[in-house]
């Protein structure tokens, strides 16, 4: 009369047979949470990369602006001489 029952197997079988929809919902919630976390992480990485690019562009802007101003002044001088 001394039978050994595997309690974890009994609980697992009961959960599958009686609480199938609840287990599916819990699994879907878990997957949804993981996807949200990965999307937020990737979005933050992209945002930080975009900010770094903006900083680099701002550092290069005065150089480009100076080149533009000097070339436009030269063009203006040439136009003055031509007329």
Swiss-Prot record:
Domain of life: Bacteria
GO cellular component, one term: plasma membrane
Record GO biological process: cell division
InterPro entries tied to this protein: Cell_div_FtsL
Keyword Disulfide bond: no
Keywords: Cell cycle, Cell division, Cell membrane, Membrane, Transmembrane, Transmembrane helix
Transmembrane helix keyword on record: yes
Major subcellular location class: membrane
Recorded topology in the membrane: Single-pass type II membrane protein
Pfam short name (any one): FtsL
Side of membrane Extracellular, spans: 42-83
Cytoplasmic side: 1-20
Location(s), subcellular: Cell membrane
Transmembrane domains' residue ranges: 21-41
Family classification: Belongs to the FtsL family.
Entry function: Essential cell division protein.
Name this protein carries in UniProt: Cell division protein FtsL
Organism: Buchnera aphidicola subsp. Baizongia pistaciae (strain Bp)
Lineage: Bacteria, Pseudomonadati, Pseudomonadota, Gammaproteobacteria, Enterobacterales
Encoding gene, per UniProt annotation: ftsL
